[in-house]
UniProtKB/Swiss-Prot annotation:
Residues 40-244 form the Lon N-terminal domain. ATP binds at G398, P399, P400, G401, V402, G403, K404, T405. Its EC number is 3.4.21.53. GO terms for molecular function: ATP binding; ATP hydrolysis activity; ATP-dependent peptidase activity; sequence-specific DNA binding; serine-type endopeptidase activity. It comes from Borrelia duttonii (strain Ly). PANTHER family: LON PROTEASE (PTHR43718), LON PROTEASE HOMOLOG, MITOCHONDRIAL (PTHR43718:SF2). InterPro entries: AAA+_ATPase, ATPase_AAA_core, Lon_bac, Lon_bac/euk-typ, Lon_lid, Lon_proteolytic, Lon_Prtase, Lon_prtase_N. Its main location: cytoplasm. The gene is lon. Homohexamer. Organized in a ring with a central cavity. Induction: By heat shock. This is Lon protease. The active site is at S724, K767.
Length: 816
């Protein structure tokens, strides 16, 4: 607002005040400024508090406030201004539509001011710009009416004058005047604002000065609520000192920046002079030397088409940029990436591929896993016949610790090419895979281009780990990027955001790993050859420990192989009672724990040269066993209890089904143990089936009409789902109904139909491994799974009697 306009509105205020005083005198009343209505419309101010005796503009944009302004202009023109609390403003900002109803008792400060609207200007975009003259301090009492706009009742607050004007107060008053003028000189503020009030009026002086200081909302409100003029003088002086400290810090920062700029300008001037001198002398500078090196590297690359043109433009730009500019570094880094990428066609030489050598490498690095190795060798043999690895995408699925990642490294050794691994577990930003655009500060290429730069070949083996743990976010969908990366039709011209050039990655052999297929999108899954890896049985773990883990751990810890021997019984104990996971990570962890303790003993007592780990002294090194036989195997089984077999993403496990009966007026079944919908349906099917054959079982109908059957599966915190517990649940109901105990060491798995047919299930190998680990001797499985049973290695099946069934009636014959 221009100074002439301010002076004009100031004259309007003075005229209005003069008229009001004359009217007050004629009426015999004593009014300092205007009438003092106790009921006034309220306008909530979001920013800082407003003080009395000030002339300020306020922008009105909300419909509620505009209605309040229109209303008071038709009347006495008096409104009240109260400041909103920060808590309400934060809630309003976090609200999705940005609108919240104001609770005037809680959301505004209790002390505000009354003000007279002097002028209203309509804004082009809607809303008003009003100019008000603030009058008195008031305290919010209550809301009287809140229809189109709030009308509140207020109490007028009287300031407490100074009773005794002593030397201290005089010093404070003088300091306020002095510091205010000092701030004016720094801020270059117009001094006419001080002439709005009588300077001798200490209370008004405090209000005017506080209103001009850029302090916090809380500090301003504290001054507004201070009725004692004496206390208000002290608070305002504190604010003035804070303001001057802030000005001093700002000036210091500005001075530092100015000195830095002057130094940079001086350096630039000197560098330009040096550059001119070098040019006159014919001496080539460092930048020119760097440009020539970069150009020679790029000329040696096999660039074509779009890549050749784009890199040429970047090289030309590089020649003109100054070394001190930020863009110089960006362009140089980009060109260095270009020179480090394998633009030449470096395909794997499949003519030199030897199947026997490949088999030896896989056998050397991984024990057992015959089925997996065969699948890998078959897959690579096809690539040899095609003499190309284009479109080679393999997905290894299995529990943690079974060797998925290390198999990827072995495949790279088989193909005699480089290996690069990166994990996408937890990645939510597609830029991690496809790179950031160069416009961003600190931009980098994605993992694919980084891998090619590191391996320096365009036909490496890339292992993308933990693909099932990718998640989408507002930063993009990494799965969609992986579709582009893995699609043979698209990855011929893969375009990284940072590189921004087409790059052929079709010769890359992609291996992906996952613990589960459930979270992987079907379109992505269809592009891959899926190979399932199951967990290890105890015999395999012990053999792997002897051949691979123990030598590795001894070497890592500096212990000689003759200084420590493991008895077979100790390794069996570790496998069965300490490391029951399907992989080998826990097994290796316990071996490391033992070797570290032996290393300490060898250092402490050098007279003992060798130690032996046996079943008897194992607890001394790794503590008490983590696992024992399942509790229900240690105790006698009771009627209604049956052992089932389950499968998870991390391998198989045994599952106990418990049932009990209680007399109830509402017979039926009650299910607990955190069962999923499919398992609940299986329980209902089993209950209905057992009820339908109750006559054949010679079970009295009253069993189903009189009792509530409660079915529970222990470990209630663990979610359980799937149809494969159908025959197990039915067997539990039958055992309970006949009051007979199921034969010991019997486990079962199979889906049950409503008519009593037993249908195929999945995860058979993992379930058998879990059963064997827990000492199960008899397993009932669906006859439809015979093919799966035949594929399972004989060492896993040894010691277990398998009973293949087609119907529930065959299961019943095997129960007791």
């Amino acid at each position: 607002m221009k100074s002439r306009e301010i002076e004009y509105f100031m004259e309007e205020i003075k005229d209005t005040v003069s008229k009001e005083k004359k009217r007050s005198k004629n009426s015999g009343g004593i009014l300092p400024h205007f009438d003092k209505p106790v009921r006034v419309p309220l306008i909530a101010v979001p920013s800082h508090p407003v003080f009395p005796s000030m002339f300020i503009p306020i922008v009105i944009v909300s419909d509620i406030d505009m209605k309040a302004v229109d209303y008071v202009i038709k009347g006495n023109g008096i409104i009240s201004l109260f400041v909103l609390r920060d808590k309400f403003l934060e809630k309003s900002g976090n609200n999705k539509d940005g609108k919240l109803t104001i609770n005037y008792q809680k959301d505004i400060y209790s002390v505000g001011v009354t003000a007279k609207i002097v002028k209203k200007i309509n804004l082009p975009d809607g809303g008003y710009n009003i100019f008000v003259s603030t009058i008195d301090r008031v305290k919010f009492v209550k809301v009287v009416l809140n229809e189109d706009f709030p009308i509140i009742e207020v109490d007028y607050l009287k300031q407490i004058p100074i009773k005794k004007y002593d030397v201290n107060l005089k010093a404070i008053y003088s300091s306020i005047l002095l510091k205010t003028k000092e701030i004016f000189s720094h801020r270059k503020m117009p001094e006419f604002q001080l002439n709005m009030v009588n300077i001798e009026d200490k209370g008004r002086l405090c209000d005017v000065v506080a209103g001009m200081i850029a302090s916090s909302k809380e500090s301003h409100q504290e001054v507004l609520e201070t009725l004692s003029v004496k206390d208000r003088l002290k608070k305002v002086l504190e604010l003035l000192y804070e303001e001057l400290n802030l000005i001093e810090i700002q000036n210091k920062i500005a001075k530092g920046i100015q000195e830095k700029l002057e130094k940079q300008q001086k350096e630039f001037f000197l560098k330009e002079q040096l550059k001119a001198i070098k040019t006159e002398l014919g001496v080539g500078d460092e930048k020119n030397s760097e440009f020539l090196k970069m150009k020679s590297k790029i000329d040696a690359l096999a660039l074509k088409g779009e890549a050749l043109d784009a890199v040429g433009r970047e090289l030309e730009k590089f020649s003109f940029l100054e070394r001190h500019s930020s863009e110089y570094i960006v362009v140089r880094n980009y060109l260095e990436l270009i020179t480090n990428l394998p633009w030449e066609d470096t395909k794997v030489d499949f003519d030199k591929f030897n199947l026997q050598r490949a088999e030896k490498i896989l056998d050397k690095t991984h024990y057992g896993m015959r089925e997996v190795k065969d699948r890998i060798l078959e897959y690579i043999s096809v690539l040899k016949l095609r003499k190309s690895q284009k479109g080679a995408i393999m997905l290894l699925v299995g529990p943690p610790g079974v060797g998925k990642t290390s198999i990827g490294a072995a495949i790279a050794e088989v193909l005699n090419t480089k290996f690069f691994r990166f994990s996408v577990g937890g990645i939510r930003d597609e830029s991690e895979i496809k790179g950031h655009r160069r416009t961003y500060v600190g931009a980098l290429p994605g993992k694919i281009i980084q891998g090619l730069r590191i391996t320096k070949t365009n036909s490496p083996v890339f292992l993308i780990d933990e693909i099932d743990k990718v998640s989408s976010s507002h930063y993009g969908d990494p799965f969609s990027v992986l579709l582009e990366v893995l699609d043979p039709e698209q990855n011929v011209n893969f375009r990284d955001h940072y590189l921004d050039l087409p790059f052929d990655i079709s010769n890359v052999f992609f291996i992906l790993t996952a613990n589960s297929l459930e979270t992987i999108p079907t379109p992505l899954l269809n592009r891959m050859e899926v190979i399932q890896l199951s967990g290890y049985v105890d015999d395999e773990k012990i053999e792997i420990a002897r051949k691979y883990l123990i030598p590795k751990v001894l070497k890592e810890n500096g212990v000689d192989k003759d200084s420590l021997k493991f008895q077979s019984s100790s390794l069996v104990q570790i496998a069965r009672e300490y490391a029951r996971d399907n992989g080998l990570r826990n097994f290796e962890k316990y071996l490391k724990q033992i070797v570290r303790k032996i290393a300490r003993k060898l250092v402490e007592d050098q007279s003992v040269k060798a130690y032996q780990i046996s079943k008897e002294n194992l607890e001394e090194y790794i503590g008490i066993p983590v696992f024992r036989k399942e509790k229900f195997l240690d105790k006698a089984m009771s009627p209604g209890m049956v052992m089932g077999l389950a499968w998870t993403n991390y391998g198989g496990s045994t599952l106990i089904i418990e049932t009990v009966k209680t007399e109830s007026k509402s017979p039926g079944i009650k299910l607990t143990g955190r069962l999923g919908d499919v398992m609940k349906e299986s329980a209902n099917i089993a209950f209905t089936y057992v009820n339908s054959i109750s006559n054949e079982l010679k079970v009295h109908k009253s069993f189903f009409e009189k009792y509530m059957i409660h079915l529970h599966i222990p470990e209630g915190a663990t979610p359980k789902d799937g149809p494969s517990a159908g025959i197990t649940i039915a067997s539990a109901f039958i055992s309970l109904a006949l009051n007979k105990t199921v034969r010991p060491n019997l486990a079962m798995t199979g889906e049950l139909s409503l008519t009593g047919n037993v249908m195929a299930i999945g995860g058979l190998k993992a379930k058998i491994i879990a059963a064997k680990r827990n000492g199960v001797e008899h397993i009932i499985i669906p006859k439809a799974n015979k093919v799966d049973l035949d594929d399972i290695p004989i060492n896993i099946k040894n010691g277990i009697n398998f009973h293949l069934v087609d119907s529930m009636k065959e299961v019943i014959k095997l129960l007791f």
